[in-house]
Amino acid sequence: MIKKFKENYSIILLFSIILFFHQYIFQQFFPNNRGYIGHDWEIFLPYLMFGKIWFHNNLLSIPWFSPSFCCGNPFFADPQTMYYSLQQIIYLIFDPLISTKIFFFILSVFGYLGTFLLIKKGFKFNNYVSLLCAGLFLFNGFFVYRAIAGHVAYLSYVFIPLYCYFLIISYEKKTNHIYLALSALLFANFFHSGSGPIILIIFTSILFVILLYSHFTNDFKIFLKLFQSSIIGTLISSSKISASLFFLSNFPRQYPATEFDSLVAFIKTFFLSFFITPNQNYFNESLTSMFPFGLHEMEYSVSIVPIILIFFISKKFFTLNFYNIRFILILFIIIFIPIFLNINFFNQFQIISKIPILNSTWVQFRWMAVYILPIIIISGLIIQNLNIELKKKKYLVLILVSLLLVQNLIKDNGWHLNDQKYSIQNAINFSEKLKQGISQEIIGPAVILDKSGTPKKSDNKNDMFFFSYSPLMCNQAIFGYGLENLKTKKITFNSKKILQDNSAMYFSNKLDEKDGNFMFFNPSCFLFPEENNCKPGDTFTILDKEKLIKFSSYEKFEFKQNKFQIITNYVSIFSFIICLLYLIYHFFIFIYNIRKKY
């Protein structure tokens, strides 16, 4: 009893120490000492602040459109928006600065604890090995440096271990469907938290984890449970998925996919990015791309620990038998997929460019993220199978944890600090206005031009809505990185204001008329043009004046949807309610049994 208490105490202490150092190292980026956060927060922080206004005015009603960006555009249908998500709840409660810190902390805990539970309860490794694996995942660069850069849509990646844990437990406890319901909700969360752009990477990562679990347990029936979970989760999020697909179909885009020059370049980049530190110059020189990438894009670090563990591989892994051959085949599949998508060996990129969804993604090296969890699981497997006494295993884990912490403590993060260019102050000031109960309304469209008359380069394009104007030159990748698919010429400006830096702000009132149309896009035309008798990029007509006034005041307005979207709306809400009621029912049963027992 005392021995078990001491071990649990040691695990909790070590667990807390690892988490403390993680937060100590990375909370300094939220914000940095100049009050800035990562550049892509420019997109997502305004999204979350819009969600705050929408909730105040409309509670849980679907935010189909937003007047805050692009002079009116679809919001719910954007795969990267996240109104029904954990992060939106956090930003509803706290001010932007505190919310950003809490958000990073909560995601860290979910990823950390989820991995510990997955390795401990799912893969049945001991406490210390599970803790090391959890630590490796906590510090992985794909999570940490995407959070710093503001790639908020990618951060739901951290829920993969927790999802896999729920799925495995639901399979092992076949009569208990609580974990299946939890896994389905978590699967739906991948869509609703804005992870649409990397949903294939997330699902492939899940497949790899479950494939390794099936191999170790010599039982592949869990894939039926994965099918059930993903189907229920897809039903819950079917409204979001359907709307996103309709939006994307109206604005198809295909950019040339990134491609490594050779297998050697891919392997070298992988090795440096995962185990040492990325080489930005080498990466960009060996990659064919539309433009060079920042250091944050090549950060996947799981530390040098997995490399060290190679020297501890047990001889039994080299025995030629069916079990090991199957394991090698699984590893080959895991290794091959990112290589296949990054190096055009067989001219397969032509085929990939014709595959729906896959052809809309072009930054293919992000597929390296699917390596993270297999590397961590195999690292744990190596230690778990060491033929040494448990005490020595504990000491080995402590040494490896120390290496993990030291490597992250001494790492030069200067580039990431200097790359943070988005000021959070506008959002903080806007949040104060909301607290004071000041009603919000968009006055009209606006754009800022520099002295040469071209759109001014800015790190806070979407912030304009904090000042009651909707930016025409917004940050919305669906319209193209240069907004080439947005009919910007339909918006004209009647007023001009010279700013302090001699740039000029051109703006109009939304009710200014031109040829029977107002100066604001009708967002329903971007999403359901046929049903609303218009074309993508059409503006509100003078007959739609009441709709425009409601829309610009963050109120719902009437528009038509196609039949399939209406069906998926009902499917989503009923699936969610059934799942939620099932969990609530079992929660009350659980409470009742506790009270009855004591």
Task: Tell me the role of every PLM-derived stretch.
Residues 1-5, 121-125, 168-180, 212-225, ...:
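Membrane-interface junctions at the ends of membrane-embedded or membrane-associated helices
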Residues 20-29, 54-59, 90-94, 128-150, ...:
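Membrane-interface helix-loop junctions at the exits of transmembrane helices
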Residues 211, 235, 302-339, 555, ...:
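Hydrophobic, aromatic-rich transmembrane alpha-helices
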Residues 1-27, 225, 321, 567-598:
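Start-transfer (signal-anchor) and selected internal transmembrane alpha helices
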Residues 46-50, 56, 236-314, 438-439, ...:
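Periplasmic/ER-lumenal interhelical loops and adjacent helix-loop junctions
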Residues 9-17, 219-245, 257-265, 326-335, ...:
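Hydrophobic alpha-helical membrane-interfacial segments at the cytosolic entry of transmembrane helices
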Residues 15-20, 109-122, 128-172, 176-214, ...:
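Membrane-embedded helix bundles of polyisoprenyl
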Residues 17-112, 135-147, 151-157, 263-287, ...:
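Membrane-interface coil-to-helix junctions
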